[in-house]
Amino acid sequence: MSNPFTPALLWNLADEFGTPLWVYDAATIRERIAQLKAFDTVRFAQKACSNIHILKLMREQGVKVDAVSRGEILRALAAGFTPGFGEPAEIVFTADVMDEATLATVVEHKVPVNAGSIDMLGQLAAVSKGHHVWLRINPGFGHGHSNKTNTGGEHSKHGIWHSELEEALEAIKAGGLVLAGLHMHIGSGVDYGHLQEVCGAMVKLVERAKTAGVDLHAISAGGGLSIPYKKGDATIDTAHYHGLWDAARKQAEAVVGHSLGLELEPGRFLVAESGVLLGTVRATKNAGSNHFVLVDTGFNE
């Protein structure tokens, strides 16, 4: 990993603006976006960084946005993203549950919903016939660089359980909703062998949707692309990553008989290496064998 900032620059910024201070390098973000240009749609998981100026930069680069809360939908709108049922939509809302205020917001602005529970489909259909939805499917397995980032398998609350796909598709048909696509995000960190398994699972889901008589327009590879946290850590091979998913997309297209969009939903991959947090040391103290350095940034360890 590289550091785009010189010590002198950071000192000057701290002197000019004070601390604590977040500093981002736009060129690094643009470079990361360019690495993923082979995907039809790059959709930024803004939970990684919902700074309005970062969101505006994403929009200027042609990146779409994913929101996981009503607040994130409003931030996307404030950054200039256009709501609506486009293909691809500029804003998609992803969640496993919706409160009434969030439901009203996605209906008002025609924001497609990436549903992680079947109940969401009925709630949406009751107030917004024709609404576009994605189905986030839990394939029954997961992967992550830690248990906290593993979002697949029976111990994860995220996504509709794979065996309930047909029930979800029936809810879409019965509710007069429109299926935009199928989504699968099972965790953070990249293992190419495991990724191949995920791609195969997606193709099988598309086959089942075809059998159920429900068409779709796209598939989403989710996110979780890894970054190097320290010198010597491996970097992701984005060309290989795309190649695996593109092969799966082509298999899925053969099933449905028409072209399918291929989305990717990176978060930290686009921003984590672009920013630094500047703080000022305000105190130091000892506690037995431990030495603490106290800064003005809060608990951001």
Language-model features: where?
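C-terminal active-site-proximal or functional interface alpha/beta core segments in diverse enzymes
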Residues: 192-301
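Structural preference for beta-strand elements that scaffold enzyme active sites
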Residues: 41-43, 62-65, 88-92, 110-112, ...
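Glycine-rich tight-turn/loop motif centered on a GG-T
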Residues: 18, 84-90, 104-112, 147-160, ...
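Structured alpha-helical segments in the cores of large, soluble enzyme domains
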Residues: 76, 161-177, 202-216, 248-249
